[in-house]
Amino acid sequence: MKKIKLLFRIGYAYHKSAFDPIIDLLLNNDKYDVWFSLDMEKIKYFIFEFPYRNQIIEDWKKLGYRFTNETKGFDIVISGDTLRNAKDYGKTLLIFLNHGTGIKNILYRNLARSPGVKYQIFVEGQHRVDSLLKCPYLGKSEVHLIGLPKLDYYFQGKFNREEVLQRWGLNPAKKTIL
């Protein structure tokens, strides 16, 4: 049986947490051939920008994550944002799974910039569903209410506060400076 070739198109490393429960589910399913791609992050020093590759990506590779720069040949592309170059991905199922909550209007602006591109848009609440259905730029895209997958671990009891504190060397007794 041919595997379904799936790409997680992650804009920035911090977006990945929005996909983690879904990534775990699909990586452990023999029906899927799972790949990842990232935008090149940059660090700014004064007015200069330099390419930056987050160290955590090496940790992901050790966990078996496979990265590619390819855009063609995927049956499904899951992204936390609309794709600037959706046509480059060819004939594929485009899934938009927001990496944050729906209080920003960037999705609406991005949909306006890509008329004719059909996304399956998965959102966190009924207000967002209603708002998108009223949006004049929705076009052929379809909207689905699913909640925020990145919170699944918390509600499934897989979130271990002590483990997180220890892993990142955090001390809850110290004041937080933003």
Regions found by a protein language model. Give the residues of each.
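Nucleotide-sugar donor-binding and catalytic loop/hinge architecture
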Residues: M1-I4, K158-L178
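Active-site and donor-binding regions of nucleotide-sugar-utilizing enzymes
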Residues: L7-K158, E163
